[in-house]
Amino acid sequence: MSESSHVGLWNRCLEIIRDNVPESTYKTWFVPIVPLKYEDKTLIVQVPSQFFYEFLEDKFVDLLRKTLYKVIGDGTKLMYNVLVDKSSGATVNQESTTRSTAIPQSGLPRVDERKAPGLLRAPAVQDLDPHLNPNYNFETFIEGYSNKLSRSVAEAVAENPAKTVFNPLFLHGASGVGKTHLANAIGTRIKELYPDKRVLYVSAHLFQVQYTDSVRNNTTNDFINFYQTIDVLIIDDIQEFAGVTKTQNTFFHIFNHLHQNGKQLILTSDRAPVLLQGMEERLLTRFKWGMVAELEKPTVELRKNILRNKIHRDGLQFPSEVIDYIAENVNESVRDLEGIVISIMAHSTIYNKEIDLDLAQRIVRKVVRCETKAVTIDDIINVVCKHFDLESSAIHTKSRKREVVQARQVAMYLAKTHTDFSTSKIGKFIGNKDHATVLHACKTVKGQCEVDKGFRSDLENIETLLKKRNVSNGER
């Protein structure tokens, strides 16, 4: 068929769909769909992301099927061309089903994850599933001040595995800061650059399960031999080995063999080696042989960039004030940020709500642990002045003392971030300053955060105290 034919068919489908869904739903989920081809009773359309595809199949598959049958005829199939990498234009085809949530597979044979890998008898490289998540790559890992060092080291390891001083590479940080993503990204890049290398990603928990099974089945030697054939071993959540003596002993021998034979080890943990309790000293010593790199909690600006990236990759659109609100109020985990995006889209579609600040606030309140009362400028002034060891009245004076000026600027920045007051109002309430002074203060504080880790830490501590103060006030 000609291009006009498949475009025309889809446009007729859109007319029916538009009459059966709210306008906001139509614009969000159907306008971005691009018809590509119609042949053999199959309409092929392109959607902007895997998330987009899964959401359509979950919420609108019946509507799509009935519409296709009405416009084209019974038995018409719908095939999705999912855009998985916008920069390269890479796509993967997915067939519509009644309730499909399929995810693109690597094409490699998979094995029972509980089965001890030693029973595989060291399969050939092309038969070894590295168990990497292809969505966790360097292209989708958003860089900021809090993870810049870790990312740089990770890329160096990926470019030259076991050829740098970063062996082992020990990545640590709180839950949800990107350790698993970065570890997978290393493995994925290595497989791209060195397809003959045997790369394996495994969680510490799964490693323990496999080891226990090998003991039960009297195949421990096979288990150890298998792991000693790996060129790049990635173990996630290594802290789970704590207190498990036999597993630690076995891993110790595997570690030694790999390291002595020029193989790369990448380990992740929720804490630094020095804080790992219940771990043998000889292992802790080896964890520190190479590079220990921390991924800190993402800053507000990084959280905004992570949100923008996810929203763009998923082919969605959020108002900037919604992105800012989410980033400023959800600071525990990147996974929380991504979960909120999905929740907002679901609520918007199911309840026919516009994606606006009100909807975002209602969703975020369900995720954030404690709903706090509104922050006031007086709260901000009191907490800031206490931190700088100043009287609250000092902030309203014309003093040019360094600590007073800095306290005033921090208070203005926090007022801009945590209240709905205009910059003019903020200036009036804090030192009777003008709009331009407040803007300058905000710019100064942001700039100092980017270059001064100590200052950034102080600011985060002040924000934490501010939130605690208002939680306690709200509970009285």
From Swiss-Prot:
The keyword ATP-binding applies. Residues 349-476 are annotated as: Domain IV, binds dsDNA. ATP binds at residues 176, 178-180. Keywords: ATP-binding, Cytoplasm, DNA replication, DNA-binding, Lipid-binding, Nucleotide-binding. The keyword rRNA-binding does not apply. One of its GO terms (cellular component) is plasma membrane. Residues 131-348 are annotated as: Domain III, AAA+ region. Its main location: cytoplasm. Oligomerizes as a right-handed, spiral filament on DNA at oriC. Belongs to the DnaA family. NCBIfam families: DnaA. HAMAP family: DnaA_bact. This is Chromosomal replication initiator protein DnaA. The gene is dnaA.
